[in-house]
A protein has these predicted regions:
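Structured lumen-facing ectodomains of secretory-pathway proteins
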Residues: 1-193
């Protein structure tokens, strides 16, 4: 990541090197302020403005990477209450045995298979959408099968997945999609690892 060049690239001396009196210091901040450090843009935001779902009275942001309105979560489900089913495992075909997701949202864990596979398998089993919850801290930006003929699919944090599970175990497996407004959601990480 980052740029492998310096401010002397293509200079008139033909060496692509800074002159001794003009070192290439660039713009550096903590934690890479040590004089011998090579810095790369590697800091994550500690919060994101996101569309959200409401589960049991708590709001959780979601990531929607759909490029078309056909698979956009908000375009399809704005301000609606949706029934969902927690699919065990990772949302592979075998995980749907004995599970009825027809007309509901399939909620699956990250891992085990690709995001487009999770989406396609949920759709093949009758789901109207797929929510993938992270199996580790942080958020997930996933690529999906986009466009007409595919169901919407979004990703949520591990905490949102846990809230969805708790809500389902209480016997009230529904969540509400926001009305196209966003909220700032803080995440646990601030520096890339």
């Amino acid at each position: 990541a980052g740029n492998d060049t310096n401010n002397a690239y293509g200079n008139r001396w033909g060496m692509n090197m800074s002159l001794l009196p003009n070192p290439d210091t660039g713009l550096v901040g903590t934690p890479s302020t040590y004089s011998a450090a090579i810095s790369v843009a590697s800091v994550d935001n500690d919060g994101y403005e996101q569309l959200y779902i409401t589960v049991g009275g708590a709001d959780f942001g979601y990531q929607d990477t759909a490029a078309t309105s056909a698979t956009s979560f908000i375009a399809n489900f704005r301000n609606r209450e949706l029934e969902y089913v927690m699919v065990p495992g990772y949302g592979t075909e075998a995980d749907y045995a004995g599970i009825d997701v027809n007309g509901k949202v399939a909620v699956v864990s990250r891992g085990g298979n690709s995001f487009p596979e999770k989406q396609s398998i949920a759709q093949a089993n009758g789901a109207i959408a797929c929510v993938v919850y992270n199996n580790t801290m942080g958020i997930v930006n996933m690529q999906i099968n986009d466009g007409a003929g595919n169901i919407p699919a979004v990703s949520v944090t591990k905490a949102a997945g846990q809230a969805l599970l708790t809500q389902a175990e209480s016997g009230n497996a529904v969540f509400r999609v926001c009305n196209a407004d966003t909220q700032l959601f803080h995440i646990d990480r601030t520096i890339s690892s």
